[in-house]
């Protein structure tokens, strides 16, 4: 027998659906894996997705539940399964793990162990379904987590925890105000299965929830407003969508103004660089790597630094370049001889039939302004990053370099043409690249 959803709750659900518009493409195209505990928050989450499915806005989700073996209540776990099975016509994955025993073996808290196991399991399932994970965190949970992290010695990132979408985990309850959550809980008569461990003062989070949060609320703290101060709702980067649904082009590189970086504090600088990396669909820098990068920036010399995903390059006078290691500018060009089209770095150029594309060999020169100039010197002056230089195409004719194809690196930069008449046809962008 399916639960009823009142008109007032449906109005809230509709308003929330409009608020999460930046995520519509993801929600409509990929199945959700719902992390369901049986408690109040996950019950709202489950019914919200049930309503979205009834309204034909989303594909059928999958319900995931983990018995942590903390309740020692087999009867309640059985009731949770029976309720979910009889109420929601979705696929279900119910698992049991002895989290207390695993916690003792790993030397971690019950909360840390349970969270790590759940997310590892959820990741496997979401990968299998080619979907995304959904959890029931909301702004009060965020306030608890801030305090928990600060007590444990957390820094600036403690304020930015629990984002709208990160690591393929979506948290739509942040779109509900605390007042709306209370309204739903008072209006509906859905079955709630509270974990008895939530009432135990044995756990730090519970003590924060029971004693500190009420005090802050009485003093005027607003969890919704605090969360919005540190989080913006933004359209996710393209890799969360299936390839057929994504036409977003990720840049082959990004450049950060060095004067802007120099005016920032260490924390602001890391946040700024990590935001640029996110735009490239890359992970943020680690603390140790960022320290090494900062040391090099302060020396004001040219450098090239890399981690697993990215090249960080800067000349003495240039801005800081961020180049993904899978960037098209680090791959060899493609040449289509029938059309005489040269393609590289997401750009393309039609070339005259008497020229041949090639890579620049060491020591190669080009005749310019009556002088024979080393191409490496030209690339240095033009501030072409070192990792890119060996892949930048040139055009040869009569055994000499006639053109350095700088426009394929950056269309705003003109090609370098040797001192002889060479017909260079206009550049054009490759459609859809």
Curated annotation (Swiss-Prot):
Q: Which parts of the chain span the membrane according to its record?
A: none
Q: Which GO terms describe its biological process?
A: tRNA modification
This protein's UniProt keywords: ATP-binding, Cytoplasm, Ligase, Nucleotide-binding, tRNA processing
Per the record, what is one GO cellular component?
cytoplasm
EC identifiers of the protein? 6.3.4.19
Q: Which GO terms describe its molecular function?
A: ATP binding; tRNA(Ile)-lysidine synthase activity
Residues making up the signal peptide according to the UniProt record = none
**Pfam families the record matches:** ATP_bind_3
Reaction equations catalysed = cytidine(34) in tRNA(Ile2) + L-lysine + ATP = lysidine(34) in tRNA(Ile2) + AMP + diphosphate + H(+)
Q: Where in the cell is it found?
A: Cytoplasm
Q: So where does ATP get bound?
A: 37-42
What's the entry's take on its domains?
A: The N-terminal region contains the highly conserved SGGXDS motif, predicted to be a P-loop motif involved in ATP binding.
In terms of NCBIfam families, this protein maps to: lysidine_TilS_N (TIGR02432)
Q: What does this protein do?
A: Ligates lysine onto the cytidine present at position 34 of the AUA codon-specific tRNA(Ile) that contains the anticodon CAU, in an ATP-dependent manner. Cytidine is converted to lysidine, thus changing the amino acid specificity of the tRNA from methionine to isoleucine.
| Annotated family | Belongs to the tRNA(Ile)-lysidine synthase family.
* Name of protein: tRNA(Ile)-lysidine synthase
Query: Gene that codes for this?
Result: tilS
